Amino acid sequence: MDPQEQFIRRPEATALLVIDMQNDFLLPDAPVPTAGGLELVPIIAHLARRARLAGAPVIFTQEAHRPGREDFGIERFFEPIHCVEGGTGIEIADGLAPEPSDLVIRAKRRYDAFLGTELDLVLRLHEIENLAVAGVCTDVCVSATVQHARNLDYRCLVLLDATAGTSVARHEAALLCLEVAFARIETIDSACKLVGWGAA
């Protein structure tokens, strides 16, 4: 992506989008584990506080599946059962609970957080121009969501130090692919400077 692309430098024009920071992706015995995902919890919690102080919306996505698995689609053939409604695996990680002012996109049934959810509507109602994206998994749900966001004309920043993949190698490969046309890859500090979120 062109590094000269201009991001709208009004703090409230950028949303922090936190993808799927849930127990079933983060805990040591998670059915769909990430490499380093649990270590992101305090990092993203601090980032979320920074975004709120700047007046930016903080949006969490929460993957969810029905107990009968009828909404798993073809995932049921190659992924273990995860994020089942009513279970603890669906819960957002301890230490990262959304604040009352935050938004939660629930019942995300697919990798892409826009598909079948109100995410785009919520962003447009808040007049969001930029997305700063954190969470897991870089090579799956983060990637799918960012690509859709770009096609909807959102400017995307994927946060290098606030994302994790199903492996370190896949995380790095996903970032390489995304920066070709879909997102700027930035650290938290450099992204905050770009969008005007102020000091750490």
Task: List PLM regions with ranges.
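Internal catalytic-core helix/loop-beta-alpha segment
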Residues: A93-V136
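Glycine-centered short loops/turns at secondary-structure junctions
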Residues: L53-A56, E127, D153
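Short Gly/Thr/Asp-enriched flexible loops that form oxyanion-binding sites at enzyme active sites
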Residues: V142-L152
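Active-site-proximal loop->helix
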Residues: G165-V180
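Short, hinge-like loop/turn segments at secondary-structure boundaries
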Residues: E75-E79, R150-N151, A173-C177
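A short glycine-rich beta-strand->turn/loop micro-motif centered on a GG-aromatic cluster
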Residues: A132-G135, D153-V168
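A charged, well-structured terminal subsegment
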Residues: F182-A200
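Active-site acidic carboxylates
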Residues: M1-L103, L194-A200
